[in-house]
Amino acid sequence: MTMSRLPLAVAPLILLQACSSFNSESPQSAPQVPSAELSRPETITPQTYVMRGQAVIGHETRTIQPCGSQHQYWLELPKNVRPEAEKLTRKPYQPVYAEVIGYLEPPSHRGFDSDYTGRFVVKQVNMLTAENPKRCDQPLRPTQVLGNEPFWSLKFDNSKQASFAMMGEDKQSLKLKDRKLTQTTRRYEFDDANLQMSNKLCNDTMSDTLYGWTGVITIDGQTRQGCATLSNSDTTLSWTGNYVAQSTETAGFTVSMTLLPDHTAITRYEYPDNSPATEERGFWQQLNNKQVQVIMTRHQQQYLVSQRIFTLDGNKLIAKQEKVGDIVYPIANGGLVLYKGE
């Protein structure tokens, strides 16, 4: 089977030779993480992460523009969330601020999502609000629970301590003794209180805000119920940066890859004869603490899905296979080796 992309990407990778004289640091001892491989699709499971930004939620358009980005992804919301999200706005396609937890998938070839680099599949809502859609400039926030009548809040100061505040009273510091976390529940035991969080949609009666969690706290002999959010920090951003191949003597071109904080990815193939560079665009996401998945969905602005899984080794990333369409190709000469720039 012949593909038009093959001479531009797969074939150059087969020719590519990366520098082999680099002495990598010995890996630190850590729990064994199952390795993902393109030839074994069942091993590939993206970790969920937080994406926050401005969203538009309507019948034919559902998008999210990540904070600090000009890029948009198609937003795939759970069926039970869409009607609740649409109730937040007073007019169709009114922007809202969104914090959603999930992962990216390639868009369909045809359909509402086909014009986008990827579609963000939402597994959990952290927060949706129409009250102030321009919240990207606000500082990142820890896990917190908020309640009304009277207003009260519990916010985590760090992994071992939280603060409880109620209007008109002094703030209380709570030392964490134990916690049990699952995908749908979180239970925290403090020295003088306990908190139970559940992954259920929660409406704030005082604002146009939808929260993804409910929280029940028992403190000083009283039980209070409120709405809750998890921390809105994306903990996978350590992968971001520019990566280049150090040796391309036999290939006759330079390969570079850029992973951006909005999870977009760009791969460029540049040639010494000043012919136009070949560019692919797509997205990236963490599979585990040692592997990152990079999926390209546009080749020279044309729809084409290709995928590589890079494994971290010291300060370099190594991909030994590439999947174009449904076919997995081996990358010769030890694979594509990219080094992170300063």
Where in the sequence are the language-model features?
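Post-signal peptide N-terminal segment of mature Sec-exported envelope proteins
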Residues: 27-56
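Tryptophan-anchored aromatic micro-motifs
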Residues: 47, 51-54, 59, 129-152, ...
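Lipid interaction determinants
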Residues: 206, 210, 216-281, 290-342
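Flexible glycine-rich surface loops and low-complexity tracts that mediate binding to linear polymers
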Residues: 53, 90-116
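C-terminal motif of bacterial Sec signal peptides marking the signal peptidase cleavage site
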Residues: 15-18
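Bacterial signal peptide processing site
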Residues: 20-23
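OB-fold/S1-family single-stranded nucleic acid-binding modules
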Residues: 107-135
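Contiguous, well-ordered beta-strand patches that form the walls/edges
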Residues: 56, 60-62, 68-87, 101, ...
